[in-house]
């Protein structure tokens, strides 16, 4: 298909299409919207991207993304130092923070173990987690990993490694979501909910 715009606009569309959730058609729409709102949107976006390029870092303690290291979470003295919540990636950390689900600290693994994708223990920050678990202030490691085969494999692997640390290892409950209807849930979720039922 012949290009109807210059190479710079084509390049913008190609780059936008690389973003998660944006295919070629959505990327074209986004590019047109940015161009139409050049002063109100495109210029501030370009500036924000440049600031991100210049200032964003990975936290040396937990692996969070922030403009400083240690990050805002790790330097928050109001947090409970006895809890470390283990997540696969930064998006999971941010989701838990939005929910206000914990006042503990975090540890970002970077992914989950996935032999099919070539992701092994050496590709994750598991050694740093084990080191952190030996801090005498830490009493609980919460495995907040996805309920997938890779997530569960990672959880079992970490649990085995933490056997010598003097910490309690817990994981998130699995089951019926708040507002969920049983008829719409898959069998695995229903089975997990029945096995992990609690007193009412």
UniProtKB/Swiss-Prot annotation:
GO biological process, one term: DNA repair
SMART domains named in the record: TOPRIM (SM00493)
Encoding gene (name): recR
Protein name (record): Recombination protein RecR
Species the sequence originates in: Nitrobacter hamburgensis (strain DSM 10229 / NCIMB 13809 / X14)
Domain of life: Bacteria
Similarity comment text for this entry: Belongs to the RecR family.
NCBIfam families according to UniProt: recR
InterPro entries for the chain: DNA_Rcmb_RecR, Rcmb_RecR, Rcmb_RecR_Znf, TOPRIM_dom, TOPRIM_RecR
Every Toprim domain range: 82-177
């Amino acid at each position: 298909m012949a290009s109807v715009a210059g190479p710079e606009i084509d390049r913008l569309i190609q780059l936008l299409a690389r973003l998660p959730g944006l295919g070629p058609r959505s990327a074209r729409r986004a590019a047109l919207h940015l161009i139409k709102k050049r002063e109100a949107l495109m210029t501030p976006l370009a500036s924000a991207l440049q600031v991100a390029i210049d200032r964003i870092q990975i936290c040396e303690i937990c692996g969070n993304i922030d403009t400083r290291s240690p990050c805002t979470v790790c330097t928050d003295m109001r947090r409970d130092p006895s809890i470390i919540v283990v997540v696969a990636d930064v998006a999971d950390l941010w989701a838990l923070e939005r929910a206000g689900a914990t006042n503990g600290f975090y540890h970002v693994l970077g992914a989950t173990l996935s032999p099919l994708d070539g992701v092994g223990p050496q590709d994750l920050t598991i050694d740093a987690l084990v080191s952190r678990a030996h801090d005498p202030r830490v009493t609980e490691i919460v495995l907040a990993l996805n309920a997938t085969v890779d997530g569960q494999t990672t959880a079992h692997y970490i649990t085995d490694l933490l056997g010598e640390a003097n910490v309690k290892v817990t994981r998130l409950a699995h089951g019926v979501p708040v507002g969920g209807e049983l008829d719409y849930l898959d069998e695995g979720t229903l089975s997990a909910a029945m096995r992990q039922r609690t007193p009412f």
